[in-house]
From Swiss-Prot:
Its EC number is 3.5.5.1, 3.5.5.4. The active site is at E71, K162, C196. It comes from Oryza sativa subsp. japonica. InterPro entries: C-N_Hydrolase, C-N_Hydrolase_sf, Nitrilase/CN_hydratase_CS, Nitrilases_CHs. It catalyses: a nitrile + 2 H2O = a carboxylate + NH4(+); 3-cyano-L-alanine + 2 H2O = L-aspartate + NH4(+). The keyword Phosphoprotein does not apply. This is Bifunctional nitrilase/nitrile hydratase NIT4. Residues 31-307 form the CN hydrolase domain. SUPFAM superfamilies: Carbon-nitrogen hydrolase (SSF56317).
């Protein structure tokens, strides 16, 4: 594993961990992929996008064709905040300070599509990479934790909205539905993503396996050692490469108190306290760790993916193929959007009435 210092200026060096095609099948395609381990510039979306571009440029300089960012990189993951609810959630209004905190968080989120999405698409096109970006999406007054996909031609492909926020995330994020569980068939392979603890949902994983996912992206906020076991299991279960990207951040990467206060930790952490140590990792379909996990700092974690490894792994175990028993166990996925309000146009109502001769008056 080669350790390549970052050439970007400002701040501590970013380290790229690169597995240089060791043991790859020369008869199969190889994809160089990078997972980004870096912190949001909290409450400052333009600065976060500037940082993202520097990191994408650097990864592209190493020859990376696919770049995966952490959960909520654009918009931020609100570590330590309870948005005014305190330790105990109760019926009623949170404190005014919590409401103001949510207003700021809402302002830092992005609309999809929107100008920030246009800029991210331009980055993907400029540096000729497939880009998988974790964002906080704003739709009206509701926020969603989402992943956006872009291709090297500078096109926005689509998104995945987190189906099930975890714990206090449910206070601030809405719930996705089955209409945004995409797997994109790209020249690099079939690429999709689930976010953080969604990856613990067996049926949701199976939906991706059913779509033939080959490069499984797992943006996360979970830095615990046990997360590595989950990532290894998914690689083995799905016969796919798993790319998990998490932020590395210190207290000083968030606004200082009293603007932003870390709750539930007993006392306010010092500026240099690590509040998320990362753990980003790349794992092969055979369960081999190709790069990472890194717990040391901001990093570009890069490996060459030998796509021939997928076929070799599927020979042992194909969860939606020769190892499936659909006459006993099967999965039905509702992939229709679920909207709280739907309108039928007057023209549609008229057409429907004319086509139904048995329609009753109302």
């Amino acid at each position: 594993m080669a350790m390549v210092p970052s050439g970007s200026g400002g701040g501590p060096p970013v380290i790229a961990e690169v597995e240089m095609n060791g043991g790859a099948d020369s008869g199969a395609a190889t994809v160089r992929a990078t997972v980004v381990q870096a912190s949001t510039v909290f409450y400052d979306t333009p600065a976060t996008l500037d940082k993202a571009e520097r990191l994408i440029e650097e990864a592209a300089g190493y020859g990376s064709q696919l770049v995966v960012f952490p959960e909520a990189f654009v918009g931020g993951y609100p570590r330590g905040s309870t948005f005014g609810f305190g330790a105990n959630i109760s019926i009623g209004n949170p404190k005014d300070k919590g409401k103001e905190e949510f207003r700021k968080y809402h302002a830092a989120a992005i609309e999809v599509p929107g100008p920030e999405v246009t800029r991210l698409a331009a980055m993907a096109g400029k540096y000729k990479v497939f880009l998988v970006m974790g964002v906080i999406e704003r739709e009206g007054y509701t926020l969603y934790c989402s992943v956006l996909f872009f291709d090297p031609l500078g096109r926005y492909l689509g998104k995945h909205r987190k189906l099930m926020p975890t714990a206090l995330e449910r206070i601030i994020w809405g719930f996705g539905d089955g209409s945004t569980i995409p797997v994109y068939d790209t020249p690099l392979g079939k690429i999709g993503a689930l976010i953080c603890w969604e990856n613990k949902m067996p049926l949701l994983r199976t939906a991706l396996y059913g779509k033939g996912i080959e490069i499984y992206c797992a943006p996360t906020a979970d830095s615990r050692q046990v997360w590595q076991a989950s990532m290894t299991h998914i690689a083995l279960e799905g016969g796919c490469f798993v790319l998990s990207a998490n932020q590395f951040c210190r207290r000083k990467d968030y606004p200082p108190p009293p603007e932003y206060v870390f709750s539930g930790l007993g006392e306010e952490p010092s500026p240099d306290t690590v509040v998320c140590p990362g753990g980003s990792v790349i794992i092969s379909p055979s369960g081999e760790v190709l790069a990472g996990p890194n717990y040391e700092g901001e990093a570009l974690i890069t490996a060459d993916l030998d796509l021939g490894e997928i076929v070799r792994a599927k020979f042992d175990f194909d969860v939606v193929g020769h190892y499936a028993r659909p006459e006993v166990l099967s999965l039905v996925v509702n992939d229709q959007p679920h909207l709280p309000v739907s309108f039928t146009s007057a023209a549609e109502k008229t057409t429907a009435a004319k086509s139904d001769s048995t329609a009753k008056p109302y």
